[in-house]
């Protein structure tokens, strides 16, 4: 045993790896696994920085864009119906504008059609009402004429306000006349001549005793005034229909605020 131990010591002494400068090679590498694992652990949570609020907002907007595009490509039923009715209105109004220009099919009748439209203008009606009011000598006549004057002024202000708000152009590029500028009847919606004709005809039918033929002629006159505005290209069909409706409601409003004979006499005396 002592001989074998001395032999082993001599073998270890003669081994090159037992020298001091080579001792590190005999030991297993320490910390080699830890840096790798620590590197993995460190690289795990720091793969990507947390998204900022701006990036999240942009991502959210990019997700919403296809939905908005789908909404535009697939409009609602109301939008389709409205656009269809608008297209029909424009098409039919252009077809009925047979006196819209010098090259139109009924260009020779343009002067006569414009004359029919002038009968529904506000300036002649206001001037005629004031003239009749000055010449009237009865209290009943003055009461009717004062309320008619109130209705005409209400019509001009209502139509001018709605036209200024909507600013719809006519089917043809026709410039308004001097009388149109005086009554602020510049745009197409609603048709001021149509609203005035409807209001005046309803006013006369309610407060004047007229024979049946005159009543029929009064209604036909209001219809022809509205049609003439479409024929010369100043209004669409829906503009005229809206004018008729507004004229009727104006008449109902005047009936609600009807001025009595005493009030009319006070206004006349003050004037």
UniProtKB/Swiss-Prot annotation:
Q: Which InterPro entries match?
A: P_Acid_Pase_2/haloperoxi_sf, P_Acid_Pase_2/haloperoxidase
Q: Where is this region: Interaction with MTOR?
A: 70-91
Q: Which residues lie on this side of the membrane: Cytoplasmic?
A: 1-112, 163-202, 261-271
Q: Where is this region: Disordered?
A: 1-68
Q: Which GO terms describe its biological process?
A: negative regulation of myotube differentiation
Sorted alphabetically, which keywords does the UniProt record give?
Endoplasmic reticulum, Membrane, Nucleus, Phosphoprotein, Transmembrane, Transmembrane helix
Q: Give start-end positions of Polar residues composition bias.
A: 24-36
Topology with respect to the bilayer: Multi-pass membrane protein
Induction is noted as: Up-regulated during myoblast differentiation.
Q: Name one GO cellular component term.
A: nuclear envelope
Highest taxon, organism lineage: Eukaryota
Cite the CDD domains for this sequence: PAP2_containing_2_like
Cell compartments where the protein resides: Nucleus envelope; Endoplasmic reticulum membrane; Membrane
In which tissues does this protein get expressed?
Answer: Highly expressed in heart and muscle.
Can you tell me where the transmembrane regions are?
113-133, 142-162, 203-223, 240-260
The chain's Extracellular topological domains, given as residue ranges, are 134-141, 224-239
Spell out which residues are annotated as carrying Phosphoserine.
43, 62
Q: What does this protein do?
A: Plays a role as negative regulator of myoblast differentiation, in part through effects on MTOR signaling. Has no detectable enzymatic activity. Knockdown in myoblasts strongly promotes differentiation, whereas overexpression represses myogenesis.
What protein family does this chain belong to? Belongs to the PA-phosphatase related phosphoesterase family.
Quaternary structure and interacting proteins, as annotated: Homo- and heterooligomer. Interacts with MTOR; controls MTOR-dependent IGF2 expression during myoblast differentiation.
Supply the name of the protein: Inactive phospholipid phosphatase 7
User: To which species is this protein native?
Assistant: Mus musculus
Corresponding gene? Plpp7
């Amino acid at each position: 045993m002592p001989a074998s131990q001395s032999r082993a010591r001599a073998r270890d002494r003669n081994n090159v790896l037992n020298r001091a400068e080579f001792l590190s090679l005999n030991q297993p590498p320490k910390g080699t696994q830890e840096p790798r694992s620590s590197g993995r652990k460190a690289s795990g949570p720091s793969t990507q920085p947390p998204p900022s609020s701006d990036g999240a907002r942009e991502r959210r907007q990019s997700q919403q864009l296809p939905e908005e595009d789908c909404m535009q490509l697939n409009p609602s039923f109301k939008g389709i119906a409205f656009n269809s009715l608008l297209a029909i209105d424009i098409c039919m109004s252009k077809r009925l504008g047979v006196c819209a220009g010098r090259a139109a099919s009924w260009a020779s009748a343009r002067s006569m059609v414009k004359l029919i439209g002038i009968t529904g203008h506000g300036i002649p009606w206001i001037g005629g009402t004031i003239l009749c009011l000055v010449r009237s000598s009865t209290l009943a006549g003055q009461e009717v004429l004062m309320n008619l004057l109130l209705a005409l002024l209400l019509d001009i202000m209502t139509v001018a306000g709605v036209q200024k708000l909507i600013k719809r152009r006519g089917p043809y590029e026709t410039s308004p006349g001097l009388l149109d500028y005086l009554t602020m009847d510049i745009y197409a919606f609603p048709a001021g001549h149509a609203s005035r004709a409807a209001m005046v005809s309803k006013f006369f039918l309610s407060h004047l005793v007229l024979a049946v033929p005159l009543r029929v002629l009064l209604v036909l006159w209001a219809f022809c005034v509205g049609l003439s505005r479409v024929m010369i290209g100043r209004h669409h069909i829906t503009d005229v229909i809206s004018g008729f409706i507004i004229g009727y409601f104006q008449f109902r409003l005047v009936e609600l605020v009807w001025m009595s004979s005493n009030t009319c006499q006070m206004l006349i005396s003050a004037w």
